[in-house]
Amino acid sequence: GELNDEAEDLHYFGGEILDAYVFANFNVGDVGANVRLCRHTIYWGQSLFLIGSVHSVGGSMNTFDGIKALSVPGSEARELFRPTNKLSTVIQLSDSFTVEAYASFEWENIRIPEATTFFSAADILYEDYEMFLLTVAPAFPGFDGPVGIGLETQDDEYSDSGEWGVNFSYYFENSGLEVSAYYLYYNSKVQDGKIGVINAAQGLTVGFFDEQIRALGLDPEPIKAAFGEAPDVVSAELGQVSIGKYKWMYKEDVDLYGLSFSKDLGGISLGLDLTHRRNTPLRSNTTQVVQSAFDNYPAPLAPVLEANFGPEFDFDGADGANYPRVPVGNTFPAVFNGVGFLTDTGIWQGGSYAFELVLAYLDEVTQGEELLMSTPTISLEEGDTSSNLALAFNPTWYQVFPGVDLTLRTSANIGLHGSAPNGLGGDEEVGLGTIGLEASVNQLWSADIRYNFFFGPQRNEIGAQWKDRDNISLTFKRTF
């Protein structure tokens, strides 16, 4: 089949300019400073890989390229981050004390593979998707209507301004320990929040509320007839009707407080990030969120509908700043990692290895606890913890051919325990990995061939959907 227009635009546009900024270096007395303006990336914290960065500081500051993350498993987080327009500065107050700050004036959500492409995920993730199908909820007893409900997409607008952060770093020369303290005020880039609303008047015509009407001693048919025909059938074969609308929202005004520590110990560069997020979006039960909100109550039924389903929901007024009916709370993630270099053992001549352990704790749900993710395989609640492990092992052989070095590229990422409270934070037993060979020619050109694989239970959650997408990739790169 053919790719849709959005897929062709994203996957076949030929190239793009990433970093494009102006900068200045100057001194004020004995204090050195650097300032950058326009499209660039800054990356605080110690996280190495994607899951670690999602839970740490770097993934909160930046959006990232999910297409590359899937195409090249094991990519370091800094290779996935995408630049946005911002103003940033680094001020070197002394040899040991550094202050950094930034203010962003461009917001961009994460880039995911478009629909109809090899790595495309659930269609509902795309803003151009037209229908979201729901099974009939137990809240509508006796309903004998279509097998699903289609809801029309209504896109939302997001603020490009308001994100900022500050970083204080101190290097203890005697111990070789660097300590950093962070504060970020940011907007989520991950699709954690979806809200929808069912048009109650339309729902009435297709029989949603028959049981509630009969409970009042009334005949639903004359009442339904007063509101005209049922909505047009979107799919005659499936009997789906469009009786509502939904949209994605990205939570604004999230607070992050963080500490990080880094030190070389025994030839290994160790890093630790401890963060606390307040007012952060949590993973939600999408079906329950959408089919438990209504607008356009028919006047004769308004009292009974309000008694059963609550007041009418202001769908159009909801956005990232006014974030109703989506779970929000506070979390405590921790990221611990290490990077080391391989020495000549006779089996290999050099190379590197890395590990990253991620822990996440759901401390408090401050809004929408009843709407937290709840499926047969994932059920979140306050006090839950999750863990995730990433490993990379890359031995190298030098001058295998004149000017050619070979490196074996291996990496894997797996959810060890539980499910993360935030989107893309990892799920138990779900993971991905890669094994391949990279040839570097004169340290300028490289060719990389890999077998990339995905594993874990076949489930509906994001991440498990790529279990059947194992592939072989070939990459050429030129360094300037």
Residue ranges and their predicted role:
Residues 1, 33-37, 98-101, 177-179, ...:
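Transmembrane beta-strands of outer-membrane beta-barrel proteins
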Residues 1-123, 388, 417, 426-431, ...:
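Outer membrane beta-barrel
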Residues 2-6, 54-72, 115-152, 191-246, ...:
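Solvent-exposed loop segments that connect transmembrane elements
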Residues 19-21, 86, 165-167, 258, ...:
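Membrane-embedded beta-strand positions in outer-membrane beta-barrel channels/transporters
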Residues 23-35, 44-48, 96-99, 112, ...:
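Short loop/turn motifs that connect adjacent beta-strands in outer-membrane beta-barrel proteins
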Residues 39-43, 103-109, 172, 183-189, ...:
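Transmembrane beta-strands of outer-membrane beta-barrel pores
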Residues 467-480:
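Outer-membrane beta-barrel "beta-signal"
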